[in-house]
Each structure stands twice: as structure tokens, then as C-alpha cells.
Amino acid sequence: MWDQKWVIGNWKMNGRLQNNNSLMHRFRILPTAERVLIGLAAPTVYLLQLHNAMQIVLNNRILTCAQDVSRFPDNGAYTGEVSAEMLADTGTDIVLIGHSERSLYFGEKNEIQRRKMENVLNVGLIPLLCVGESLEEREAGKEHEVIAHQLSILQGLDTKNIAVAYEPVWAIGTGKVATVEQIADMHAFIYKEILSLCGSDVKIRVLYGGSVKADNAADIFAVPYVDGALVGGASLSYDSFTAIISAAQNA
């Protein structure tokens, strides 16, 4: 896992039962990709459907991922919340933490994200922390400062396995992609920060996210310190998603 390329698809608020089943059945002919860890992050209501399909149809070749988790560690009067323990019950393996859309629409910042990280680790799941700067922050030359602040929640966590997705906010769903030089700079910086915060013996995966598609995936995977991709809209298409997986396998 920690020496593979990761390709994680984030469906966001998309999917229907019948459409999900159709996509899962297409994945039965998924090309061989031993060098790639593949995951799909579905809306919470479809996680059990996804997990069952992974077991029955795909022999666990694709991991089940959740898009979010509650900040509250225990069961209780938190209407609408889903705990890390509940996600574990659905067969979830990886949980996205801190996606920019959570910050944008729900005001989630470092303190909440740290609590979510701890909750996920406490039940044995893998958190995938999302970080990224806005266009205004990049134009002001503050991208390193912003990312360092977001990564600071990793300090002191009880884990030696760290997964981060770098998603420049200005490239999410916009069709814009950071240049190879920008991606290389930020991924090298993120590696350096993680080693500083968590120690030299930590295992690291740093994914790139931000309009990753079949036609640019190979170039992105060739960038130093890019360990995979967090894929948005392209993960809803079998052809696009498998093309990205193949690019990772061949990187």
C-alpha cells in the first residue's frame, strides 16, 4: 500500500443505486494494476453498496473510501452525523479529511480536521488529508505558508503512515491544472513538511488532485514526489477512470 501509486476517485454528491451497480459491474474487467492502490469515495448512503460490490464482484480490488466523517468521537445526539466507527462498520478503508469543499461550504478548519483525523485513526482507518491554496493565496505568494498551516494538524498524531492530497483550490472542477513546475514544487514542500512534523521514519503518500483526467494523468504521475491522484469528475466514467489507473500503473 505505502509503496504503490494511489488513485482515489471522489464521486462527491453523485451516484444512484442503479448507476452505481452498472459501474461496479464494468469494473469486473478492470485492467491488472498491481502497482496501483485503487479507491472510490462514494456518498455515505452508498458505502455499504460499494463495499459489498467490491467483495462480491471485484474480490476487494478497489478500496471503499468515505468523503467525510463526524468530528464527534462517540455515538450521541448529533443528528445527521456519521461516526468513524460507523464508517468502519460499512467496510470503509480510507476517509477523506478536509476537502476544500468542506471548508468552503461548511466552514471546517484545522481544529475540526484534527479531531476527525484522530477519530479515523482510533478505529483503524486511514485518513487522507486534503490541503490546497486559493488563487488569491497563490497570487500573493503565500502558498507554502498556507499549506504549512494546514499540514500542522499532523504533528503529534499517533501514526507513522501519512497520506495527503494536494488540491490547489483554483484547479478543482475548473479544468485548470497546475503546471508541472508548480506541482513538483508543492509536492516536494509537502514531503519536507511531513518529515519535519512526523519524523524521518514516517511512510508518506502525497497525491495530486485538481482536474486530473485521462489526457493529463501520465504527465502528472511523472512529476517527482507525486504518489498518485485524487480524481473528481473523471472517476464517474469507467473509461476515464481506468485510463488514469493505467497511467499510474505505467508511471
UniProtKB/Swiss-Prot annotation:
InterPro entries documented for this protein: Aldolase_TIM, TIM_sf, TrioseP_Isoase_bac/euk, Triosephosphate_isomerase, Triosephosphate_isomerase_AS
Main location: cytoplasm
Positions that bind substrate: N10, W11, K12, G173, S211, G232, G233
Catalytic activity field: D-glyceraldehyde 3-phosphate = dihydroxyacetone phosphate
Signal peptide start-end: none
Keyword Cytoplasm tagged: yes
GO molecular function, one term: triose-phosphate isomerase activity
Record-linked NCBIfam families: tim (TIGR00419)
Protein name: Triosephosphate isomerase
The organism of origin for this protein: Neisseria meningitidis serogroup A / serotype 4A (strain DSM 15465 / Z2491)
Gene name of this polypeptide: tpiA
